Structure formats: C-alpha cells, structure tokens
Amino acid sequence: GEWITNPNGTLTMNPFLEYMVENSDKRHQINTTVYGLVSIPWIKGLTYRLNYNYTLDAKNLYNYSRYEASQQGEASKQHDNSSVWLLDNIVNYTNSFGKHAINATFVYGASRQAYDNTLAKGQQYTSTVTGYNDLGQAIIQTIRSSAYKESNLYQMLRTSYNYDSKYLLTATLRRDGFSGFAENHKFGLFPSVGLGWVLSREAFLSEAEFMDNLKLRASFGVTGNQTSRYSSLAKVELNAGSKYVFGDGASTSIGSTVMRMSNKDLKWETTAEYNVGIDFSFFKERLTGSIDFYRATTKNLLWDVIIPTMTGFSSVRSNVGKLQNTGLEIVLGGTPVKTKDFQWNVRLNFSTNKNKVVSLLGQDTDGDGKEDDLVASGLFIGESLGTIYDYEVEGIWQLADKENGTIMKGFYPGTYKIKDQNGDGEITAGEDRVILGHKEPAYMMGISNDFSYKGFELRFFINTIQGGKNGYRSKIAKPDYIGKSIGNAENLSWLTAYDYWSPRNPNAKFATAWLSPTVDTNRMQNRSFVRLQDVSLSYNFDQRWTKKLGVSNLRLFISGQNLLTFTGWDGWDPEAGIGFTTDSYPVMRTYAFGIDLTF
C-alpha cells in the first residue's frame, strides 16, 4: 500500500496518536527540615540556631507507543533523581546599653546539589505485548546516563551598631566558595559597610512638624557572581567519529575528543558598588519616597570569549575586563486628595541604568594607542554590553537597480540594501558592520493610581519602557519561506508576510520572502512601549447590610490585564522582543469577574 499523506503532501503524524500510548509517570518527593534554637543562659543575648533542609525528588517515567519508530513500536524507561541539602550554623548576639544597641551574627554553612539520570530506550519491536517492560527485545537499543553535583561553602560575619536610633552602622564580611571554579580560585572574599543618619530625630529639626521621617544612607559593598558547574574544566566526550586502532590487526575503538577548553585561572566575577540614598515621609505620610544613586564596577567578567578556529574550539569561559554601571532609582508615593468619602493614592517608580565596558584584555595589537575591542564576542570599549554591531540597512534593492547595473554582487531585487561603509563596492563583515544602537532601555517607569469613593475602588497601573534615541532595539524577523514546502510555515513572520517586497509592492517595509542574498540581515526596531497593565473596579458592600445575610464581607470586582499597548514594535510583545512568528504568542489580554465572600 501507500502512505496516506496530508493535503499539503507532508507525512506529519496525526496528533491523536499521542493519546494511543501507554504512559506511567510516578514522582516521589521527600522534604526534611530540622530546626534548633539554643539560648546561652550565662551570656545575655547570645543564641545558636541550626537550620538543615534536605529535598529528594525521584521520577520514574515509562512510555510505550506502538506507532512510533516507523510503526514498529518505541518504548523507554527513564529514572531521574535529584537532591539538595542546605546546612546553616548561626550564632547571634544582641544587646543594648542605654542609647547604644549592637548586634552580631556569624554564619557557617554549606550546600550541595546532585542529579542522576538514566534512560533506556528501544525501537522496532517484534511483539507489542510487553511494551516498556521488555526493552531487550527491541531491534534498536539505546542507553544514556548523566550526572552532576555542585557544592557551596560559605562563612559570614555581620555586625551592626545603633546609637539612639539616629546613627546607624552595619559592616559585613562574607567568604564564599564554589566547586565550579578553578582549583586555586574557588573562594572569594566580599566585604560591605553601610551608614545611616536619621535626620528627623535630630533636635535641630524638631520644629519641622511637617516631617515624619528623613534618613540619609550611604554604603559600599562587594558582591560575587559564580560560574556554572564544571566550566573551568575541559569537556571530554566519547565520539564515534574519533576511532583509533591500538596495535596491528586490532579492531577499531571509539576514542575521546576534547570538546571544550579548560581554564585553570577561572575565578569569581566581583562587583564593587557605591550607593547613596535618601528616604523621606512628609505631611503625616501624605508624601513618601526614596531616591537612590549608585555606581557599580564589575571586574573579571565571566564571559565566553571567542577564540580562533585554528585552536579547534569556538570559545573559552574566561575572566575579562571591567564594566561600569551607573543608575538612578526613584520611588514616590502620595495621597493628593483625602476626604471623608473620597481618597486618591498614587505611586510612581522610575529607574535608569547605563553600563559601559571600561577595559577588556588590555591589549593593543594594532598599535593605534587604544585598547582592542573583542569584536567577535560583541564587546567594545566605551560601549554597553548590549551593543548591537551589525550591517546597516538603508533600503531595499529594486528592479531598476538590476537593470542599470548598480545592484551589488550577491544581492537581488527585493533583498535588503546594506550600506557599504567603506565604499569599496563589497559588503564584508570586517569593514561594513557598525554600531547600530543598544539593547538596553534608556529608562523604565510605572505609575499606579488608586481611587476610592465610599464602597467603590478603582485601580490601574501603567507601565512603560523607553529606549531613547538608539536604545532598547532588536531585530524584527522577516518572512522565511526559503527552503520550505508548500503549506509549511515554520518560523514565518506573519506580519512581514503582509508587507514584504514584490514587484507590485516596491515600497514595502520588509525584504522579499523568496530570496536570500550572500550577506543577509534584518531591520532594527525600537521596542519602546506604554502599556495599561492592570485595571480593576470593585465595590465593598456595607457590613451593616451584609451581616443581615450572615456574611461579614461581600465584595464584587471586575479586572483586566494587558488591555492596551502603545508601541511602534512590529511583533507580539515589545517587552519580550517577540515578533509575529509561528513559535511565539502575544501577551494575553485577560478579564476577570468575581465575588469575594467572608463568613
């Protein structure tokens, strides 16, 4: 006989066959928590606490389908076991002497995470009776297993001092160790110190009755970022393509291949941050807020540095350079109107952050007096981590360009016209790519409003992310019919299918869907947006009325999320950078209506 094909000529499996399988999914979890607290009687304020937690997850997944593996059956058994344990020893001392208050905490702890997996699989069965309980009768048999473990060891000493609730001091010293780093660099030392001054408690401000609270803060601290497990070690794999013969006349054996380079100098990425801030509350908390300014310098960034292909590897995990982040965060809250029956509360948050690469490898191989960029890794001195370095699109090649011979070699009418930056008549990666902008936004802001009138309450929240002139940019996917069969729309950008180039649509926004030039790229778009994210309207019934019904509280509400989005982004979601593709989804617009009852 002949296979029954789909209308478009493909042999895609009938989705209902997925229900004609024998599955078993058994999961077991064990959680153990041990907690102990001891107060030392002969030293006032001294305590010891023990925290221990252990979690074990075990999964047994069995599957059998007689229609898989070319209609001859496929079965598998998979066993997964993962465990995590955490142990903390905590010594704490707290005491006060008149206007002085002190606190000291010492922590010694450790944690470990482990995972083990085994999969046995069989394909093409002579009998369908035993299914996954007799994998040995399968013609094609596969066995795979994997395992990993990682551990942390840490100590921390924190002390704090408080004088008359006006002058505050906190100092911390933390030592962290992680198994994923190189042998001689597993531990990092991270100090921090913070100062606080509550001005509103000072005598010289005692007559400022409008002031509820005014506090100045300043801090400095160092934090660490750990790498992934085993990333400092070389990765070696058995490879059927790397066979060898040991001795004359011997049979071939499967050899091993080094798939990733080791780095014996891999160590902690560290960030030193300065922060100054102010907290305030005025007019009996009718106006509240906080303002923070920070500058953070990160050294020894953990980065997969691109290396020459002649080494046999594409990249190596390394510590590189220095990165600086500077930012401002503002939170404001207020009650502009407050009467007996009506109240309006508003809250605004604003944040902006700019980062730039200060240094990289410290090399000047071209002798121009400037430190070299790591172009292959996308790192540029003086630019942000999210720098977009690509070809610049300045239009679309037209039929007239081909007719008059001005079209570049390797391009066709309907393909993107890439700007020839050096004017040599060719488009090359080394000479014609430029910095087009940055992925990071210029600022983020949100504002919430809460209006209440008697039993009614209206709330809404507006969220916005703005990119400024060249920020918060991403590529928007173009149509992708190339190499696809009729009716197959994998990775197709639906939006661009409505405005792609054709002889009848020469002024289209996007390139043709049918041709691929020698050098290709996509247009960049700004993802800035303003979104009405949450809205709710509710009514609380008077308790004098609800009590007659035997109900202490009765509330009706209606709400909606993601109701409106204003943006120039051609795609489903500007915040996630998702275009109109078949493997992505829009932000869901949801509505809800409900009743809250309390008896």
Task: Please describe what each predicted stretch is.
Residues A69-Q72:
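Flexible, solvent-exposed loop segments that connect beta-strands
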Residues F451:
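Short, structured surface segments that line ligand/substrate-binding pockets
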